[in-house]
């Protein structure tokens, strides 16, 4: 943050170094724990990050189909990140941020959750999140979602060997994983 109080007194100079410092801290903790298999994902980056970060995350999208900050924006951000070298990235299935303040209502619907899970089958990581309004948002365990979500997770599992090949190629050639 620009208002940070640092020993050398230069928060603006340090500003763009925070993502790297955070990744360094996480890698150090993993080494100390002897747990290099644990996945840590990041949503900020820097030049050289792909070789040092296990997974990127698109951030807290709105729980809608929108291209400015919803499902479409996550997909576009991941594709753009992929061609920029961030080959291992994902988004919260269904988005995260809902709004329930009249007159604005942005609540995750079963249809959005299913469509988001469907395209996430083709990403390096299929990960759910209950979102910031769990009692209002559709969830993967809801009666009108669970069968479709189970089908998508079976598809994701069935693609494991293919995904491994794609990820290995991404690591060797820098080709986006999606």
Where are each of the predicted segments found?
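Catalytic-domain carbohydrate-binding cleft regions of carbohydrate-active enzymes
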Residues: 1-178
């Amino acid at each position: 943050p620009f208002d940070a109080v640092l020993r050398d007194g230069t928060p603006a100079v340090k500003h763009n170094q925070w993502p790297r410092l955070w990744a360094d801290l996480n890698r150090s903790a993993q080494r100390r724990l002897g747990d290099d298999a644990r996945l840590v994902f990041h949503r900020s980056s820097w030049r050289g990050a792909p070789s040092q970060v296990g997974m990127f995350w698109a951030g807290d999208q709105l729980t809608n189909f929108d291209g400015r900050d919803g499902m479409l924006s996550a997909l576009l951000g991941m594709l753009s990140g992929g061609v920029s070298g961030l080959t291992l990235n994902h988004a919260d299935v269904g988005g995260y941020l809902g709004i329930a303040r009249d007159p604005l209502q942005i609540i995750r619907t079963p249809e959005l959750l299913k469509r988001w899970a469907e395209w996430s089958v083709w990403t390096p990581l299929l990960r759910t999140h209950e979102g910031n309004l769990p009692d209002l948002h559709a969830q993967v365990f809801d009666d009108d979602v669970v069968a479709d979500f189970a089908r998508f997770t079976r598809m994701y599992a069935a693609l494991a060997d293919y995904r491994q090949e794609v990820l290995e190629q991404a690591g060797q050639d820098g080709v986006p994983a999606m």
